[in-house]
Amino acid sequence: MNRIFLPGTYADGVPYELLRELRGAVPVCWVQEPAVGAWPAGPGYWAVLRHADVRHVLRTPELFSSHLGATQVRDPDSAAELQFTRTMMLNQDPPDHSRLRRIVAGAFTPRALGELTSAIERHAADLVGSVREHGEADFVHLAADLPVRTLAVIMGVPEQDRQLLVDWANRVIGYQDADYAHSSTADPDRLTDLGRTALALRPTTTTTPDGRPVNPRSRAALTDMFAYAHALAERPRPGSVLARMRDGGLSPAEFETMFFLFAVAGNETVRNSLPGGLYTLLGHPAQYRLLMRRPELLAPAVEEMLRFWPPVLHFRRTATQDVELAGVRIRRGEKVVVHHAAANRDETVFPDPDRFDITRTPNDHVSFGYGPHFCVGAQLARIQLKAMLHQVITRLPGLDLVPGTVPARLGSNFQNGLKHLPIQWQRSSGCGIGCGR
């Protein structure tokens, strides 16, 4: 049963068959946490696999807390690090969670997103236009630039410093996938003075004195990012998320973890969803042809992509008291982990759940969470997904995977991402939406 914990399992794909079997037999099951590499073993946790149970856990913070042990399966390395991590909005319970969410919610109103949509659509068009005549590209690399551009706009990060956002996100992914642990792609000659100062503060030590790897999510490993955030906040763009954070009465730790949440988590949701969604669509040619014939299905197609390829595989809660869930007695202080991928294939909610169907309605997936912690940027993510996929399927005729492609997946039990996705298309202009494939 500990297979669903091991990060290496997911390098071969989400184990949907195992999740289906467990969901039917033991929908709340105990999972061991063996040591992984240099990371020590953990105490184990309860995995929650049914859609209804997942929703119940997510909507009852009085029973299942985000704050007691944060929202990652593994606890931070020290009590001090846990205290810092708990200041993040993601790791708070009401009323503090509500207070933090109100500070940034104004950036995600329908009006604010409406003003941002044209810029996102323009960025998507520019990215696809930059490769259109090449006939092939790695869609992971191509798509990764869209959330970075979007975040730079809403956070007020100068264009010259955007690549820092990529490096910070990569280093956090490196917590489980070593290919990303030492990302350093920002060009010092292109950075602003703030960016160059931050780059000089980048930690170079990758192990602790006792030989354990430094947790790339820790405060010590992200000193450059936090220094940059504080410096940029001294001259924020009016109306930006950073300006709202500066003026919102946040403590220094709350400010830093909020910046982390946008710069890293806000990046990875779209960065994982776009390649995963396109890979899923191209793997179902009949559904691709249907979308080409009926472009009005793009919005429900995006929802089905999110159901089929949730960008985040799980989140953790901690029981605040002894409680029963699906007939299982959970003790106070035990870890409870909701599995989005399992809930999204629950046959009691989704008829024929393993079938990819862009006309599926309703589509009550939990890829953006549920309850108080429903993703504040969910609509922004949807706008980006629709903008990029619209450009790809209308401007890259004959789109397909490069023959023989076996996409490399992240070795992560938390993020559902691809490392590479080679795609190809016809260079000459021709068929777009409105004709077949």
Which sequence ranges carry the predicted segments?
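Cytochrome P450
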Residues: 1-437
